[in-house]
Amino acid sequence: STGHYYSDDKGNWYYKDANGENLKGAQTIDGQNVYFENNGRQVKGDFAEDGYYYDGNSGQRVTNSYVRRGASLWFYVDAEGRKLFGEQTINNQDVYFDQNYGTQVKGNFASNGYYYDEDSGARVDFGKNQFVKVDNNWYYVDNQGKIVKGAQTIDG
């Protein structure tokens, strides 16, 4: 059975099958894994309901890559195309992805207590058992290099 892609006046893409019906859900067309919403619109440049990210141009499922959603939200998808969560090592860099949403932590402390660079997202080594200044705020890092919170006795 053959079909064809077509677009609407808003630049959205669809695929009609041999019966003239719009495809829906996960599909493989010409060897490419693509996804169509319930209204038939192809998902491009975003995560679909199946949890995978689809390329903004080709619409093909993305694997083993950083992907961006909107202006500044970064994610990483694995060999299957699924979001990563928590502490990860990618390209020899220790990075962190939010446990709930999978967004990369940049320019902030993650829930694991480490700080991640605002540009690269790589974990910053502040040393151990010392005060550090980040964005005009002072923090204390413990013997593991993690930020401490709450009341603390330092050198006491």
Identify the residue ranges that each predicted region occupies.
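Extracellular adhesion/carbohydrate-binding repeat motifs centered on closely spaced tryptophans
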Residues: 1-156
